[in-house]
Amino acid sequence: MSVMASDKACAPVRASRPFPKQKLRELVLQALYALEIDPEGEDSLVSLLMTEASVSKKNAAYALMFCRAIRANQPDLDALLDATIRTTTLARLTIIERNILRMMLFEHQQNQDCCPVPVAVLIAETTRLIKKFSYSEGSSLILAVLGSIFDHPAPALDTPLEPTSMCG
């Protein structure tokens, strides 16, 4: 426990529990979906996430930060995905499938320097998110695309997050 220097009684302060990465990914996916449906709705997104996902304002804002970074890199992410997908186009995938691909690709590229997430973890999370938010029939294409991309070194992002944003 730590104490706050500004408190006269020096009352102990409990550190908040770290926000689980699985929950963060779900929030980011929901935010990406909402913004693809309503691109002008970012102003109300934090309160929407707080209400619908029952999370704190801090955690909703944290998820929105990732959402913004993914959207800032979307042209590069989509170009890589379009170059990898062979049997269809990115535009023909569902909104959820596109955003799962973007999010996992972003996380893979983002964390290469500071704390790389093992590919097996990203694949397992992709599978979990597809089962929870999409149709399992689409999982083989999504997993094949990510597997193909993860086999090669990740290109650098134009708009990275803070170096330790996804770490810990």
UniProtKB/Swiss-Prot annotation:
Instruction: One GO cellular component term, please give it.
Output: cytosol
Q: What does this protein do?
A: Involved in transcription antitermination. Required for transcription of ribosomal RNA (rRNA) genes. Binds specifically to the boxA antiterminator sequence of the ribosomal RNA (rrn) operons.
Q: Which family does it belong to?
A: Belongs to the NusB family.
Name the CDD domains for this protein.
Terminator_NusB
Is Transcription regulation one of the keywords UniProt gives this record? yes
Biological process annotations from GO: DNA-templated transcription termination; transcription antitermination
- Gene Ontology molecular function terms on file: RNA binding
Domain of life, per lineage? Bacteria
What residue range is the signal peptide? none
UniProt cross-references to HAMAP family, sorted A to Z:
NusB
Taxon lineage: Bacteria, Pseudomonadati, Chlamydiota, Chlamydiia, Chlamydiales
Which organism does this sequence originate in?
Chlamydia trachomatis serovar L2 (strain ATCC VR-902B / DSM 19102 / 434/Bu)
Stored SUPFAM superfamilies? NusB-like
Which InterPro entries does the entry link to? Answer: NusB-like_sf, NusB_fam, NusB_RsmB_TIM44
Q: Which UniProt keywords apply?
A: RNA-binding, Transcription, Transcription antitermination, Transcription regulation
Q: What is this protein called?
A: Transcription antitermination protein NusB
Question: Entry's PANTHER family?
Answer: ANTITERMINATION NUSB DOMAIN-CONTAINING PROTEIN, N UTILIZATION SUBSTANCE PROTEIN B-RELATED
Q: List the disulfide bonds.
A: none
